[in-house]
């Protein structure tokens, strides 16, 4: 697998763009790579998508009529031809590497070539409000299961099974972690800063959630209170229910944050309560777009209608995202670790944001 120079882009930066401001919160850049074999139907398909925070900004699909890295956000379209040529070549090289990884994995697991198999990788970096590295990561999976991951120290690996231990020993002998760490601490951070600057109006905005509580009778004795948050960005949000001031986490049904289809997100949290005791329950909402946390109660006189159309649209978009980017099977645990971010006066136009100096095969 390649790593430096995913499933998880850098440009010539002028001195005038040196990072001096701070951002409201932490930010991330991730690339998600997926290679899927299809016996009897040609080479494995390879897809890579890049995200800054919750926004997809680039995509490459080897099955396209003319495979190229393509823009998926307005702010990335300003990049010049050299950028797109470089990212396309990096993606094509990674496609070949991951196809080889599929063949290697078949040998490691003693599997037949008759079946379809999947090799995935997610890699990238997080920066804090000051633009400095919080954490770098690189995780691989085979057939939907963890395979090998770079540890938080960016110097060692965790292998999921005996097959992955073969890869671990190979990479340790080649000192691959050192090269990957150089990418994560340098190029990755520099590109992320660049993107945050160019996409400031989109990526660094904070859309306030629209909130309300709905009431759904279950029986004569119980009802469901559902706390809604709609139209917010970024996706990070906290919804909690309390009864007489006591947290009800264990009894709360909480759905995953889902895209609304317009660049914002939706979420709800629900609790089942005894009929007649609704006033004892409060929903608490925390989000970057709120000046202070909100406290909501169900108001019987202002019963809200559930926005079914909006929710269904959100689910439809979510399905497209999941199907179109299978890559999200590899999950990143966000934990902070110290690191230094570089000045982006050093962002070299010859470096790919995805990394291109190292080719890592399992």
Curated annotation (Swiss-Prot):
Membrane topology, Cytoplasmic segments: 333-362
Region Alpha-2, residue ranges: 115-206
Membrane topology qualifier: Single-pass type I membrane protein
Molecular function (Gene Ontology), one example: signaling receptor binding
Residue segments, region Alpha-3: 207-298
Subcellular location: Membrane
Known glycosylation sites: 110
CDD domains recorded: IgC1_MHC_Ia_HLA-B
Signal peptide bounds: 1-24
Annotated region (Disordered), positions in chain: 335-362
Span list, region Alpha-1: 25-114
Biased composition (Low complexity): 343-362
Disulfide bonds: 125-188, 227-283
Any Pfam family matching the protein: C1-set
One Gene Ontology biological process: positive regulation of T cell mediated cytotoxicity
Region of interest (Connecting peptide), ranges: 299-308
Domain Ig-like C1-type residues, every copy: 209-295
Keyword Membrane part of the UniProt annotation: yes
Recorded GO CC terms: early endosome membrane; ER to Golgi transport vesicle membrane; external side of plasma membrane; extracellular space; lumenal side of endoplasmic reticulum membrane; MHC class I protein complex; phagocytic vesicle membrane; recycling endosome membrane
Residues that span the membrane, as ranges: 309-332
Residue ranges annotated as Extracellular topological domain: 25-308
Assembly with partners or alone: Heterodimer of an alpha chain and a beta chain (beta-2-microglobulin).
Function statement: Involved in the presentation of foreign antigens to the immune system.
Family listed: Belongs to the MHC class I family.
Protein name as catalogued: Class I histocompatibility antigen, Gogo-B*0102 alpha chain
Species in which this protein is naturally found: Gorilla gorilla gorilla
């Amino acid at each position: 697998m390649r790593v430096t120079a995913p499933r998880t882009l850098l440009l010539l930066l002028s001195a005038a763009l040196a990072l001096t401001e701070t951002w409201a919160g932490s930010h991330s850049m991730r690339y998600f790579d997926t290679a899927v074999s299809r016996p009897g139907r040609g080479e494995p398909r390879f897809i890579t998508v890049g995200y800054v925070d919750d926004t997809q900004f680039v995509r490459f699909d080897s099955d396209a009529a003319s495979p190229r890295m393509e823009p998926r956000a307005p702010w990335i379209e300003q990049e010049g031809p050299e950028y797109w040529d470089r990212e396309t070549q990096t993606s094509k090289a990674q496609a070949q590497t991951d196809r080889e990884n599929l063949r290697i994995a078949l040998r490691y697991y003693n599997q037949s070539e008759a079946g379809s198999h999947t090799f995935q990788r997610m890699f990238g970096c997080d920066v804090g409000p000051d633009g400095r590295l919080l954490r770098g990561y690189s995780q691989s999976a085979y057939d939907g299961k963890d395979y090998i991951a770079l540890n938080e120290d960016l110097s060692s690996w965790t292998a999921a099974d005996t097959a992955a231990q073969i890869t671990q020993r190979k990479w340790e002998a080649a000192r691959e972690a050192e090269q990957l760490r150089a990418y994560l601490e340098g190029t990755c951070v520099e590109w992320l800063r660049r993107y945050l600057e160019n996409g400031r109006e989109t990526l660094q905005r904070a859309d306030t959630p629209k909130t309300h509580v709905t009431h759904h009778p279950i029986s004569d004795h119980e009802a469901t209170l559902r706390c809604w948050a709609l139209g917010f960005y970024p996706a990070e949000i906290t919804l909690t229910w309390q009864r007489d001031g006591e947290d009800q986490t264990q009894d709360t049904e909480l759905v995953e944050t889902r895209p609304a289809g317009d660049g914002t997100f939706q979420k709800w949290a629900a609790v089942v309560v005894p009929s007649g005791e609704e006033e004892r329950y409060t929903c608490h909402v925390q989000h970057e777009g709120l000046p202070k946390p909100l406290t909501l109660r169900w108001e019987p006189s202002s019963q809200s209608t559930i926005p079914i159309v909006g929710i269904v649209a959100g689910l439809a978009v979510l399905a497209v995202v999941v199907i179109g980017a299978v890559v999200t099977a590899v999950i990143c645990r966000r934990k902070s670790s110290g690191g230094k971010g570089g000045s982006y006066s050093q962002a070299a136009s010859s470096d790919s944001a995805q990394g291109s100096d190292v080719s890592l095969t399992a």
